[in-house]
Amino acid sequence: KSLGVATLIDGSQGAVHMPVDVQEIGCDFYPITGHKLCGPTGSGAIFVSAERMAEMRPFLGGGDMIKEVHRDSITYNDAPMRFEAGTPGIVQTIGFGVALNYMMKIGLKNIADYEAGLKDYADKKLTALNWLKLQGQPNEKGAIFSFTMENAGHAHDISTILDKKGVAVR
């Protein structure tokens, strides 16, 4: 930041797990993805600092983003409206709002606590399997598990077997 370089922190993964104070972390941009917060695909939001918002110019034109049109010039609306060219994704925006309300009603701490319980349970069960080796440090990872298996065959075969048992793999 001291060199004038814009900072973007991708909040898509973390926003569902913890509250974030964008003022405290001091970033210029903080985008979040709606579908990772139980919202519809194609929805999301982005925080843009006032400093960066003032520097940005629209790359499209039309709709309510334009305040005045003259023969030789265009005056854009104030931010954030100057970035709203065309019809917004109304259904996605409403769905995203409902999803955020749902997440807030449950509570991010409650979600994190429940996820931690699932992680601990899975860690305990998987650690007990002598033919499977977990990768990473148990206390330093989220609820995604990477593992290796000796003489297990092809990864696709393993994922098919796990899928039939109700375990989501990627």
Each PLM stretch: what is its role?
Residues 1-170:
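Pyridoxal 5′-phosphate
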